[in-house]
Amino acid sequence: MRIGSRLFCVLGLIAGFAAQALSAEYLEGSARQKSRAYSPAVITEGGRTVWLAGQLALADAEGRNLAGNFEGQVREIFRQFDLTLKRAGGKLSDMVTMTVFINDPRNGDRFVEMRRDYFPDGHYPGSALITVSNFAVPGVAIEIQGVAVIGDKCSNASPCSPR
């Protein structure tokens, strides 16, 4: 009986790890959508939904001032999202959508280039990029909020959508 219980526990652990390895299904976009580093749709079925609060960054992990430093703020925001998702049992690639607010439209293309670095497999979250006139905190150049789904049963290898 003890061997059966142990085997059941081991199989349960394996199934749990396998579920964590699954990801959402990212529908392939048009050439224009790919060039802007976002997916037109992301399909999930099951998994744990993590709602990421709007994140901004006026200092990096070493305490260096990032006020007005667009690229530094982008890097720090993605670092913070990665840490938060790890605490929730996920990873940055579990993000399925993000809303990006910038206060200078000239930074839009640079953000798209930088986002590619964080999703190198090309499975980009759905996204909106919105220009705002100002933020509540001086020095902020960008704020991002997002949603992640951890351990979803859909994936590009095993799609849930009819193709």
Where are these regions (language model features)?
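N-terminal presequence-like segments and the immediate start of the first folded domain
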Residues: 4-79, 83-96, 102-163
